Amino acid sequence: MFDCSHWLRYVSKQLEAAGGDFIHVSGGNTIKRGSSMPAPGTSPAPHAHAAEEIRRHLNIPVSTVARINEPWIAEELIANGKTDICMIGRPNLCDSAFANKAFAGKTEDIRPCIGCGRCLTGIMFGKPISCTVNPSVQSDAVAPAVEKKKVLVIGGGPAGMEAAYIAKMRGHEVVLCEKTQELGGLLRLAAVPIGKQELCKVIKFMTRRLQNAGVEIRKNCEVTPDMIASEFAGYEVLCASGAKAKEIEAFGCFRQTMTADDILSGKGFPGRKVVILGGGSVGCETADYLAPLIDDRFPANRDVTVIEMTDALMAGEGGAAKSILTQRLMRKGVTIELKSTVSKVDETTITYIKNGTEHVIDDADTLVFAVGYTPAPVNFEGAHVLGDCHQVGNLKNAIAEAYAFAKKL
């Protein structure tokens, strides 16, 4: 329960007496950004309880902010007396028409903010503002193409969906082919770990946008060179076929091996004691996914170890999200071995070197590879290659590259 101390009540009342129009309640600062800009997977409106308490002592409106990324959250906060005004920060950068779409009842057309914080990362280092989900945050203008073309997009992941939509908006005739039964690509797997479910909203939004734009979508359709030569002769071909999880062939002799993607997709079923090779975002999220619930006492829970060769987990991940996940792994009892390199693997043992000392794990059931991705092979002559099959990166990179290319097509 929020303790509205005497000084806080005093300051609020003094501001009201001085003629303030309303009091804005936030939290955190540039050092503790996790409070002012909460990470993905955290609860919405974390300062609402403080706003509600302050509101009880004032006669002017009170506002609050942070993770109010859907209209229903704002409506519920106001209806329940938590606040009078909801401030929309990052979601309004993600979709500048957020409020207008909410007012018009077009909530499904709101581009979803996932709370990743990459919009502000650039600004803090003197770079332009950007957005993972909205590559057009600086300029929404998409000019019609001077020459209308027929365009084939291969791959229904984020890059393929973005390229197909922008090409269609420019007046091209677009066909999008996806070899599986669902759009989304690796984003579907990225949405599986704890706290990442909001990525499903991105897939839903991008799919709905393609359908509304009239893009022809073919699922369960694996494009071949012969198909391009016959059915798609004369088309501009954009290949966004994604990437595949890497495996270390020399370590494949262990009793059970699989990739993190195998686990997240449900194709792989690891044993009780799991060793994850790689402490990047994918490795740590998979460890979190597999590890026991905090304070769970069931003896069948897994024992998870993460082996990372560098001196830090999740290099390149945002500070707030990284901190939350690291703390959760520690509370769950996940063993983390930094500055450690696996030197030898046989059918029953995993040997790694840390600080010059050799360590042996001889009771593991499963070895999981989370050592990155390799671009999917492109077998289409003359195709424009986009997204992860061009260069493996993050979601922001894939969407931005596809947007920039399609805008000039």
For each of these PLM feature ranges, what is it?
Residues 34-38, 186-191, 251-252:
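Short acidic, glycine/proline-rich loop/turn micro-motifs
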Residues 40-43, 81, 103-106, 192-196, ...:
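Short, hinge-like loop/turn segments at secondary-structure boundaries
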Residues 176-213, 287-342:
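Rossmann-like dinucleotide-binding cores of NAD(P)H-dependent redox enzymes
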